[in-house]
């Protein structure tokens, strides 16, 4: 180390001005210095909540490279505007610190305080330090700046001292590598890869040896476990997402590293599942800043120092605040369960259930709700119990917040977390799917029946999926899902599904529901004036989208996103006769919207009596056979089982077992997909891959 000769002085004249008083204690908050002129925020590292503490430090400057002096309880920083050292007390008013030999050819953005020495770092310039002890007896003392090294390779934007071993750590923004610095020589030692990149403008330690870094670009707070010497020696130092804080292009932080991160009068809510589910703070368990507005149940949650690990419970400490979620019906594999969520205010609910009872929420399908929007009061939700869930007791976690994108762990700036032990019943049910477990088929309709008209087969396009639950070789439940893909019609049409061969009386109406865009409808859509089991999805599909285009998703030069999805969950009575139930995909069809015109040569306002089905599928009991049979080019013949086809086998509805790209508006199906003609004429024996986009004419089909 070398001491530079005195060549530059930075002096402040205090006169009769009162000096800033130090902090009263070693505060648990982290302090975030942002913007120019600088503003100081209090950052709760546990939840990510930030609060503006001081918008005016008394100096119209940017302050960076800040660090907290534990012995004298001041924050020291570097004024990048005037290239001078400042300090702030408990009122966050900045005052100039007199120095000698402070470099003037560059600024500093990296700094921290340890053992009453203020350390500064600049990539390519070196490591510097300032002895702060003379200020104890003379606040106007001139402090000498010492240059420890002249080389500094890692690209840092902050570093911090470990309160346990006194080592100095920082992350290279370019590589994500964690380095330890020798404060006597300035030499750096590579520890390991944190796995994260970015401008980590603020770094802090807590008393337990956890290193927290805040990334400027997105405000995300990461935590690195440096509490274990063996882990450090092994280079096992991953940065784990811990909370969401404020983002800023100019960011620096200071904190009293000897303080715990949670105050004794905590206003943070934790969970209480076993710690294998990541419940405690050490495990990065879920925790919410209690904001006084956002909670589940009837009462504001009480604050905890940490997560309670089962058999201890949040309900045995403070108030009984685990009362926001109610399981109305049993959790039976393959079936839907009704959940009641009581919310204090509108917000977002996410939830996880450990279906395979392996002690975590990491597995596929274990996130059961994702940013489900709740309104104030009682919310009824449908939860589909995983078909492969194990029988017996397991755990569920519910998180309610004003934030979206929460995981089962990590911090939140608002809301509450509630953990529940639940019981799942698995009595041997199995599932079968159409067209596959996760795939969707395509239904495409031409609504000009019994005429072919433009035959663009895009008047109604619906993506379609079915899951049947089977017990003892008997269908007991069916879930039909759909995504509205396109509407190229001039007429108004509805959409429905018939479970042919099944009587309406076989439906368990108390356990049958229909959801539109995730919200439960008031009724299931079951037609009460029909003998068959027919479900109306919509009487008018034009009410399910809005567009500035001439048509919805049929013109490549004018595109929209999907706007409507439905989920129809049908449960059958225990003694239901399903011996005549048709197989999947059942009978999906379109019909004329009631009270609307549907073309020449048809009865005025035919409504439900006008239907279009897949080829060779008989219409429902509501079809007006007397007035509609024999019209146009349709050659339906009940005696031979022919329905909804022309003499050349052209149908008015298509079922394709994949997500298909339909013809553009006014483009004949055969023009877009030439191979379809021979497919139809052969009765489906030739050109069976006609619908693949590789067999289509470019620019003749819609490309989402």
Name each model feature, range by range.
Residues 21-52:
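An edge-strand/N-cap motif at the start of beta-rich repeat modules
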Residues 21-22, 60-68, 102-115, 151-160, ...:
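Repeated scaffold domains used in trafficking and secretory/extracellular systems
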Residues 25-34, 74-77, 117-121, 167-170, ...:
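Conserved beta-propeller blade signature
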Residues 49-57, 92-101, 138-150, 187-194, ...:
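A short beta-strand motif characteristic of beta-propeller blades
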Residues 219, 224, 232-263:
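Blade-level signature of beta-propeller repeat domains, shared across WD40, Kelch, NHL, RCC1
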Residues 45-48, 88-92, 131-136, 182-186, ...:
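Short loop/turn segments that connect beta-strands within beta-propeller blades
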Residues 532-704:
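A eukaryote-biased signal for long
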Residues 260-456:
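A broad "non-catalytic interaction surface" signal
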């Amino acid at each position: 180390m070398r001491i530079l000769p005195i060549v530059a002085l930075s002096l402040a004249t205090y006169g009769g001005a009162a000096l800033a008083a130090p902090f009263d204690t070693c505060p648990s908050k982290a302090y975030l210095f942002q913007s120019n002129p600088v503003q100081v925020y209090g950052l709760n590292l546990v939840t990510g909540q930030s609060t503006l503490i001081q918008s005016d430090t008394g100096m119209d400057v940017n302050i960076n490279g800040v660090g907290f002096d534990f012995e004298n309880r001041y924050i020291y920083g570097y004024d990048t505007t005037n290239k001078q050292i400042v300090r702030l007390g408990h009122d966050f008013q900045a005052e100039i610190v007199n120095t000698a030999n402070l470099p003037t050819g560059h600024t500093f953005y990296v700094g921290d305080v340890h053992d009453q020495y203020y350390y500064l770092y600049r990539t390519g310039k070196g490591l510097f330090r300032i002895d702060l002890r003379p200020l104890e007896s003379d606040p106007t003392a001139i402090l000498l700046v010492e240059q420890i090294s002249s080389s500094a390779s890692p690209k840092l934007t902050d570093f911090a001292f470990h309160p346990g071993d006194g080592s100095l750590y920082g992350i290279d923004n370019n590589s994500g590598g964690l380095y330890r610095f020798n404060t006597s020589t300035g030499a750096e030692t590579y520890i390991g890869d944190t796995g994260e990149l970015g401008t980590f403008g603020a770094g802090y330690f807590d008393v337990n040896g956890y290193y927290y870094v805040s990334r400027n670009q997105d405000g995300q707070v990461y935590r690195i476990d440096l509490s274990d010497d063996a882990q450090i020696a092994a280079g096992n130092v991953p940065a784990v997402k811990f909370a969401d804080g404020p983002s800023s292009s100019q960011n620096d932080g200071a904190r009293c590293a000897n303080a715990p991160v949670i105050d004794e009068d905590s206003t943070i809510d934790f969970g209480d599942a076993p710690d294998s589910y990541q419940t405690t703070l050490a495990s990065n368990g879920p925790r919410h800043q209690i904001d006084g507005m956002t909670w589940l149940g009837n009462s504001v949650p009480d604050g905890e120092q940490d997560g309670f690990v089962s058999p201890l419970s949040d309900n045995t400490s403070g108030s009984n605040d685990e009362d926001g979620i109610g399981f109305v019906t049993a959790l039976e594999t393959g079936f839907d369960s009704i959940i009641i969520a009581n919310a204090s205010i509108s917000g977002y609910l996410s939830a996880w259930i450990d279906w395979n009872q392996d002690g975590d929420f990491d597995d596929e399908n274990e996130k059961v709700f994702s940013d489900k929007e709740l309104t104030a009061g009682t919310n009824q939700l449908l939860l589909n119990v995983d078909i492969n869930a194990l029988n017996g007791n397991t755990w569920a976690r519910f998180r309610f917040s004003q934030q979206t994108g929460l995981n089962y762990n990590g911090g939140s700036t608002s809301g509450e977390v509630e953990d529940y032990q639940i019981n799942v019943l698995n009595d041997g049910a199995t599932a079968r799917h159409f067209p596959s477990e996760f795939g969707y088929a395509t239904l495409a309709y031409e609504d000009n029946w019994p005429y072919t008209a433009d035959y663009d087969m895009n008047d109604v396009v619906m993506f379609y999926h079915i899951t049947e639950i089977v017990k003892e070789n008997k269908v007991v439940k069916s879930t039909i899902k759909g995504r509205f893909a396109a509407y190229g019609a001039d007429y108004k049409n509805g959409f429905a599904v018939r479970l042919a061969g099944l009587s309406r009386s076989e439906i368990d109406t108390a356990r049958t529901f229909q959801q539109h865009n995730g919200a439960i409808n008031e009724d299931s859509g079951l037609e009460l004036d029909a003998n068959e089991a027919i479900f109306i999805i919509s009487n008018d599909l034009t009410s399910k989208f809005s567009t500035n285009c001439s048509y919805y998703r049929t013109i490549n030069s004018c595109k929209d996103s999907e706007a409507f999805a439905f989920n129809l969950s049908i449960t059958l009575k225990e003694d239901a006769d399903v011996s005549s139930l048709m197989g999947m995909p059942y009978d999906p069809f379109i019909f004329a919207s009631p009270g609307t015109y549907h073309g020449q040569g048809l009865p005025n306002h035919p409504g439900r009596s006008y239907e279009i089905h897949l080829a060779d599928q008989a219409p429902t009991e509501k079809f007006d056979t007397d007035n509609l049979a024999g019209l146009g080019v349709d050659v339906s013949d009940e005696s031979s089982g022919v329905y909804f086809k022309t003499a050349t086998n052209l149908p008015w509805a298509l079922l394709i077992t994949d997500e298909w790209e339909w013809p553009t508006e006014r483009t004949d199906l055969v023009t877009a997909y030439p191979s379809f003609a021979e497919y139809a004429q052969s009765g489906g024996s030739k050109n069976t891959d006609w619908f693949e986009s590789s067999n289509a004419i470019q620019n003749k089909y819609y490309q989402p």
